[in-house]
A protein has these predicted regions:
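Nucleotide and nucleotide-moiety/phosphate-recognizing core
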Residues: 3-13, 19-102, 111-113, 201, ...
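Structural motif
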Residues: 132-133, 183-187, 195, 220-222
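N-terminal amphipathic alpha-helix/helix-capping segment at the start of soluble metabolic enzymes
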Residues: 169-190
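Conserved small/polar residues in nucleotide/adenosyl-binding loops
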Residues: 226-227
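Flexible, gly/pro- and Lys/Arg-enriched active-site loops
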Residues: 53-60, 75-78, 82-176
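Active-site mouth loops of central-metabolism enzymes
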Residues: 191-208
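Short polar catalytic/cofactor-binding loops
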Residues: 16-20, 190-194
Length: 228
């Protein structure tokens, strides 16, 4: 006798951080979600760096979103999200509302469901329609999804928000590269004996470091290092 397959639901979660290693906290949250036996990551957005809203005297945020499939109920999913926040070090004590946080994992959408049980859980997120820092990552994955209350697509809602002081970024080590701000040039440094262009020239560390410095002085951004 086969067991019934539990029904799965689509949910979109918004993630944000403005303290410490922001990228690490967001990626650790996504990894923790994906390791849950009743959650599967379906898609992820780009990263966006944004100015804080509401409470402005705090560091800039790194924001993103992920789409998941889950057999958890909305409240079970909320418990998972809040446990992940706690495990990664978020504390809400003595922190102003909308203030700094190590990481924030919010349920933005859950199928076409509408939930409102007061302060604990509101779906769709109560301020989704006014937050470009949530809508833009959501539009990377589900631009045509229709808000179940406002009856407008995510892409349409995004056009009604201000995206000033918000940029798509690529985290590179401890830096943030804004997409489209400049053309990036990558240098290729081969430390192999059989490279077509410079085989055997950088087998010793001194020669490799000299060429890497020359690349940096010439304006190269990253250096791709290939070795045996």
């Amino acid at each position: 006798m086969s067991l019934p397959v539990p029904s799965t639901h689509m949910a979109i979660l918004a993630l944000g951080s403005n303290l410490g290693e922001r990228k690490h906290y967001i990626e650790a949250s996504v990894q923790a979600l994906d390791q849950h036996p009743k959650i599967q990551i379906v898609d992820t957005s780009f990263f966006y760096e944004t100015a804080p809203m509401y409470y402005e005297d705090q560091p800039r945020f790194l924001n993103g979103a992920c789409k998941i499939q889950t057999s958890l109920t909305p409240h079970e999913l909320l418990d998972v999200c809040q446990n992940i926040e706690k495990q990664l070090g978020r504390s809400k004590e003595h922190v102003p509302r909308n203030g700094p946080r190590v990481v924030d994992v919010d349920i933005v959408l859950y199928d076409n469901l509408v939930v409102n049980d007061g302060d604990r859980l509101i779906i769709p997120h109560a301020r989704l329609h006014e937050r470009a820092f949530v809508l833009r990552p959501v539009c990377d994955m589900a631009p045509s999804f229709v808000h179940p209350i406002l009856q407008r697509t995510m892409a349409s809602l995004l056009t009604s928000t201000s995206m000033a002081d918000m940029s798509r970024v690529m985290p590179v080590r401890h830096d943030m590269w804004a997409w489209g701000s400049k053309t990036r040039v990558m240098g290729i440094l081969n430390a192999t004996p059989d490279s077509f262009s410079d085989g055997g020239e950088h087998m010793h560390i001194d020669a490799a470091m000299k060429t890497a410095r020359q690349m940096a002085e010439a304006g190269v951004d990253p250096v791709s290092y290939t070795h045996l």
